[in-house]
Curated annotation (Swiss-Prot):
GO terms for biological process: cell division; cell wall organization; peptidoglycan biosynthetic process; regulation of cell shape. It is an enzyme of class 6 (ligase). This is UDP-N-acetylmuramoylalanine--D-glutamate ligase. The gene is murD. Pathway: Cell wall biogenesis; peptidoglycan biosynthesis. It catalyses: UDP-N-acetyl-alpha-D-muramoyl-L-alanine + D-glutamate + ATP = UDP-N-acetyl-alpha-D-muramoyl-L-alanyl-D-glutamate + ADP + phosphate + H(+).
Length: 450
């Protein structure tokens, strides 16, 4: 950890606890800050808040009183999930108090450089691929953020010869002040999180903050096939390295003659890649670009791609029952992810979809229903998905109350050789705590069929 003095004797407000808030508060206290912790949940039953209070921190729970800002606050470190429309944050902004997230704090103390990966879809897979390629290439990666350990905890232990690889959401990137990843990858942009950002434009600008502080000594990995990402890459002053699955990129990564190339050099044959789905070729090209820029050999990259079968809840193969293959794609929390999942198969598909209603319709899915023989919907968005399926002319359309019921119905509508796919196209929070919980319940329901 770098020697950092900027927080000493400063009054810092940590807004929202959870894992990242707890880690941020603990680190700030270690760095000599006067830490005030605020959480919307009541103190009763709030285990993390009670622990911080026991460590001598000032903990205020049960709401977000504006009076907290009267304590000469120098900095607000906020939980990524708390929107900037929160009255306390609005007031802090009016007072010109800097507002950051835990990742910014982690970067400020890290002795190791950062690789940051963002995009609407594919972040986790690309992050894991990058980590595995760097590990195979003996580049000493450590993984942080939404997967792995909280960034603050990783940064405290990271050494100069290591690389911090982190997946970054738009919520985290909105709080960028000085965060400067050595390599920043922007995978794609799709209309998502409009309940948080308001418009796709604002969502894209938040993502583009990953480039905000890059200089000509840094690298920006850009999806050349995504017009929105290409436009937002104008915010980068780093060296741009493009990747494409549709055309050759002279100074970037591309596919040619059934092989993946980087800057004109053949790296790996497509036939050596075991991870399914055309969309995953985009993720692989991005991860490969990062690995090559950091000096990983073609042999190490190939070794990873010959064995990497994917990330849990991302088009995860579950089992085969009576020649029906079940796949868990619970991480598909928006339409683009489901479009890519549907495009990964040529067999007839029985689709399970539905979840939290964020205000969007599902007509964009209609062109991807060509292999879908039946759909079973659940959750808040079930009626909207039914309307889209009717427009697509599907013959078999069902709505049920629970995911368990959806699995039973999906199996009943399947025949020999079908794929039964959970790819919800929606967030999970209407019925589940997380997409991971949703995926686990799907897997349990599938095994009950055996």
């Amino acid at each position: 950890m770098k020697t950092v003095t900027e927080y000493q004797n400063k009054n810092v407000l940590v807004l929202g606890i959870a894992k990242s808030g707890y880690a941020a508060a603990t680190l700030l206290k270690k760095l000599g800050a006067n830490v005030i912790v605020n959480d919307g949940k009541p103190l009763a039953g709030n285990v993390l808040a009670a622990e911080l209070q026991a460590e001598g921190m000032d903990v205020v729970c049960g709401g977000h009183p504006l009076e907290l800002l009267e304590r000469n606050i120098s900095l607000v470190v906020k939980n990524p999930g708390i929107p900037y429309s929160n009255p306390l944050l609005v007031a802090a902004k009016e007072k010109q108090i800097p507002i950051v997230t835990e990742v910014e704090l982690a970067y400020s103390i890290s002795a190791a450089p950062f690789v940051g990966i963002t995009g609407s879809n594919g972040k986790t897979t690309t992050t894991m691929l990058t980590f595995e390629m760097l590990k195979e290439g003996q580049k000493h990666p450590v993984i942080a953020g939404n997967i792995g350990t909280v960034a603050c905890e990783v940064a405290q232990l990271a050494k100069e010869n290591e690389v911090v690889v982190t997946e970054l959401s738009s919520f985290q990137l909105m709080g960028v002040e000085s965060f400067q990843p050595k390599i920043a990858a922007f995978l794609n942009l799709f209309e998502a999180h409009l309940d948080y950002h308001g418009t796709k434009k604002e969502y894209g600008l938040a993502k583009a903050n990953i480039f905000k502080n890059q200089t000509e000594t840094d690298y920006s990995i850009i999806n050349a096939d995504d017009a929105d990402v290409m436009a937002l890459s104008a915010y980068s002053k780093g060296q741009k390295v493009l990747f494409s699955t549709t055309k050759e990129i002279e100074d970037g990564a591309y596919i040619k003659d059934n092989a993946l190339y980087f800057k004109g050099e053949k790296v790996v044959k497509v036939s050596d890649i075991v991870l399914p789905g055309k969309h995953n070729l985009e993720n692989i090209l991005a991860a490969m670009s990062i690995a090559k820029l950091l000096g990983v050999s073609n042999e190490a990259i190939t070794a990873v791609l010959k064995s990497f079968t994917g990330v849990k809840h991302r088009l995860e193969y579950v089992t085969t029952i009576n020649n029906r293959k079940f796949y868990n794609d619970s991480k598909a929390t928006n339409m683009l992810a489901t479009e890519k999942a549907l495009s990964a198969f040529t067999q007839p598909i029985v689709l399970l979809a539905g979840g939290l209603d964020r205000g969007n319709e599902f007509d964009d899915l209609i062109p991807y229903f060509k292999h879908v023989k039946a759909i079973v919907t659940f959750g808040q968005t079930a009626p909207k998905l039914v309307r889209a399926a009717e427009k697509a002319g599907l013959d078999v359309i069902e709505s049920v109350d629970t995911l368990d019921d959806a699995v039973v119905k999906a199996y009943a509508h399947s025949t020999d050789g079908d794929v039964i796919l959970l790819s919800p196209a929606c967030a999970s929070w209407d019925q589940f705590k997380t997409f991971e919980e949703r995926g686990d319940i799907f897997i349990q329901a599938v095994h009950k069929l055996i």
